[in-house]
Amino acid sequence: SSANMSFRHKDRIYISATGSCFGTMKKEDFAVLSMDGTVLSEKKPSKEWPLHLALYEKSSETGAVIHTHSTFSVLWSFVPAKNDQDCIPDHTPYLKMKLGTVGLVPYEKPGSEALFQAFRERVGASDGFLLKNHGPVVPGKSVMDAFFRLEELEESARIAWELFRAGLE
């Protein structure tokens, strides 16, 4: 798998299991966690479940989290940020309207405690996140809300990347 997603239902977090694929995912492909991160199912959760848990802890409004390795977000993460708390320029108003600020999290090995610590240190400062050389992590009130916010982040990263390549950024 090259991504992971989760949603909150009552006092549980349902997160894509290790090795699951968005394109073929069924309800059996989710691991179940308690709100303190205890695994409650036989399925093994994505190794990046602590990123998700940090966003659920940040806000009771968070109902879902999506993390991908989408092309333009990853490309943009290589460009030196002018502002680590808001690293994707808002060339159109929609990124701010739909998501807000996008914080840059320094590169750490995927799935590592160092990554989770770097993420926790920044989780309060921004609305969405870009893991350097890795990809975006976006919370939402629902799965569709998280998806729409992620889509806007990726489109904004594409616009910024194209302007950067053209020497206009």
Protein language model annotation of sequence segments:
Residues 1-169:
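Glycine-rich flexible loops
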